């Protein structure tokens, strides 16, 4: 089920409707303007000249002087001086900016009632003008604070002062929708976690023999191995409240927010014990203290200290189990991993072939499959796939099926989806004839060495269709998972990596930049053989690691090298020696099988993609040239 549908977070404060507030402000401005003009007598607008004429004619009964503005009324017997001849009791006009000394004398002579008003606003108007700016400033501050809180709290949870509220998702009993039946391929992990489920269901059975519930369980595994799904399955099986939060949700821009959220989260879990509290990606707050760029007083360390304190503070009757997931257990603080905090560590490995088949069966429950679909074959071709990768494979196959307007997902769709994930999507890149020939020989070098070297992974297919960031690909499909790598296997693997560059060299007498990735991978592999795996006779059974950790991962700012400059020189010499020997042997191998190389490259230019059966058919029809003539051909090709 969807997390968003099942989660029941605390009710959020109703959002402010800023449109209504804007209309209120505009209405207030209108009222102020209207009240300011309300004291002025309404009437027809006339010119100052017309006003003077009416005054001389004795038609004006009363005037009100307010600055430059003049308003008044006519005698009842009089009329409004207008061309249309309409009667009007009142009028208004504006005096010119210069002084008119005759006006007051004329008003007195005609017996006009004169009333004067001050230009200064009234007392209540002055109060509004003085207070309104402060209201606007305070409103702006409140609005900015509210928006900041919305961003940090996911919608304003907790009110204006609710930064310390943990943005935790709460799943009710029975609403998880995930059980151990929905999690395949991690049987060992499920066996360890089933004890926790049994304890939460029947604690008395365990307490009778003096057993205590583990305070914390750390789920360790690569990304996509099902750590979060397994945690939800534990809550679904146990039937207890389940709280879920990400480690990054604790850290904000304000000091102390992380620790406050930890307290709030643990308080909520304790109130509904027995319950399960799940912290995803705990390495974001649980990294080793006193290291990295933050020093010993950053916000992350305060949050970690609060987590440690809360886990120590559980009482015996508080059946709260803390589940945490990480793919970087090496950067976690040792105090977090000691017994009494995270008592149990559950490791989730990549699934093997049988486990992959079970995972595929789970993810294809609601997918209509064609009769030719063999999930065991799909599992055999997906070595190294995690549970999330397999779910993505099924979804990609379904998407391709929908694009083709088919009603069932067949085996071809699974093959296309796998190629898209492993090799990359096809690119509409048109290569010139020379470049296409170059790429064909490069990939043929990889494919031929993979086919000839006895310890190399079996060849699956070779293609010169641009995919992803590569102009061509050679795919090897190991028959089974390798958990330990022999020296012979690694040397043959290096030979396959260098085969493309060597093929360019012996065919065109030059090398290109297309082997950049191959050289980088080969150098890294040779360095690990020498420095970490003791596969160099000159270095012997010793390990010399050169740290590649970054400061932000929680390691020291500087890690001293644990070997001398002389040893470093020997390491570099050994790496260079291994690569040179592999290059020489691979070059001799391709020279001896030059006819196969040429035939494969020619067929690849025509067909663009060849599978293993087609490659072997090409090789069976090739007769190798005599060694003397073959060397002459190589020399000619090299120029």
From Swiss-Prot:
Its EC number is 3.4.24.-. It is found in: Cell inner membrane. Its main location: membrane. The chain crosses the membrane at residues 16-36, 124-144. The active site is at residue 443. It is a multi-pass membrane protein. Binds 1 zinc ion per subunit. Zn(2+) binds at residues 442, 446, 518. Its cofactor is Zn(2+). Keywords: ATP-binding, Cell inner membrane, Cell membrane, Hydrolase, Membrane, Metal-binding, Metalloprotease, Nucleotide-binding, Protease, Transmembrane, Transmembrane helix, Zinc. GO terms for biological process: protein catabolic process; proteolysis. This is ATP-dependent zinc metalloprotease FtsH.
């Amino acid at each position: 089920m969807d997390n968003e549908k099942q989660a029941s977070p605390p009710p959020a404060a109703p959002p402010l409707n800023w449109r209504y507030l804007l209309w209120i402000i505009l209405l207030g401005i209108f009222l102020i303007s209207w009240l300011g003009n309300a004291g002025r007598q309404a009437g027809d607008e006339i010119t100052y000249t017309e006003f003077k004429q009416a005054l001389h004619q004795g038609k004006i009964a009363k005037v009100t002087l307010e600055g430059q503005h003049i308003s008044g009324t006519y005698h009842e017997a009089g009329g409004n001086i207008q061309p249309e001849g309409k009667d009007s009791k009142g009028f208004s006009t504006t005096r010119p900016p210069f002084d008119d000394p005759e006006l007051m004398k004329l008003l007195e002579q005609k017996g006009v009632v004169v009333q004067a008003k001050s230009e200064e606003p009234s007392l209540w108007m002055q109060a509004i003008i003085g207070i309104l700016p402060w209201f606007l400033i305070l409103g702006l501050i409140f609005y900015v604070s509210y928006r900041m809180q919305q961003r940090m709290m996911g919608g304003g949870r907790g009110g204006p002062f609710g930064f310390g509220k943990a943005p935790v998702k709460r799943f009710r009993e029975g609403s998880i929708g995930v059980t151990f039946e929905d999690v395949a391929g991690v049987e060992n992990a499920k066996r360890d976690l089933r004890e926790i489920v049994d304890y939460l269901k029947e604690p008395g059975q365990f307490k009778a023999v003096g057993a205590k519930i583990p305070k914390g369980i750390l789920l360790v595994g690569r990304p996509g191995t099902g750590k979060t799904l397994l945690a939800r399955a534990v809550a679904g099986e146990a039937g207890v409240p389940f709280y879920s939060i990400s480690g990054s949700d604790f850290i904000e821009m304000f000091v102390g927010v992380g620790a406050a959220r930890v307290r709030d989260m643990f308080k909520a879990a304790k109130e509904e014990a027995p319950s399960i509290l799940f912290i995803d990606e705990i390495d974001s707050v649980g990294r080793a203290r006193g290291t990295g760029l933050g020093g010993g007083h950053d916000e992350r360390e305060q949050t970690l200290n609060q987590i440690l304190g809360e886990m120590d503070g559980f009482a015996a009757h508080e059946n709260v189990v803390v589940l945490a997931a990480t793919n970087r257990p090496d950067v976690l603080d040792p105090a977090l991993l000691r017994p009494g905090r995270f008592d149990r560590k559950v490791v989730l490995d990549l699934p093997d072939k049988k486990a992959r088949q079970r995972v595929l069966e789970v993810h294809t429950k609601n997918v209509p499959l064609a009769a030719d679909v063999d999930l065991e074959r799909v599992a055999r071709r997906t070595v190294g796939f995690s549970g999330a990768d397999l779910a993505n494979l099924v979804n990609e196959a379904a998407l391709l099926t929908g694009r083709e307007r088919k009603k069932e997902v067949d085996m071809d769709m699974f093959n296309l989806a796998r190629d898209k994930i492993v090799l990359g999507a096809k690119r509409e890149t048109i290569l010139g004839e020379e470049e296409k020939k170059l790429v064909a020989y490069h990939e043929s070098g990889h494919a031929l060495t993979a086919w000839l070297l006895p310890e190399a992974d079996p060849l699956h297919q070779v293609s010169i269709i641009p995919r992803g960031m590569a102009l061509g690909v050679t795919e090897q499909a190991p028959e089974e998972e390798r958990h330990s790598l022999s020296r012979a296997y690694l040397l043959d693997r290096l030979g396959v990596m260098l085969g493309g560059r060597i093929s360019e060299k012996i065919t065109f007498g030059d090398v290109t930049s297309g082997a950049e990735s191959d050289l980088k991978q080969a150098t890294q592999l040779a360095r690990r053989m020498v420095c970490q795996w003791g596969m160099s006779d000159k270095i012997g059974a010793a390990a010399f690691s050169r740290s590649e950790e970054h400061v932000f991962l929680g390691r020291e700012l500087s890690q001293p090298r644990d070997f001398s400059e002389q040893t470093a020189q020997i390491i570099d010499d050994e790496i260079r020696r291994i690569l040179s020997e592999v290059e020489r042997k691979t070059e001799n191998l391709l020279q001896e099988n030059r006819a196969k190389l040429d035939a494969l490259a020619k067929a690849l230019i025509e067909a663009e993609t060849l599978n293993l059966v087609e490659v072997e058919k090409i090789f069976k029809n090739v007769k190798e040239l005599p060694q003397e003539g073959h060397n002459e051909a190589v020399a000619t090709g090299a120029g």
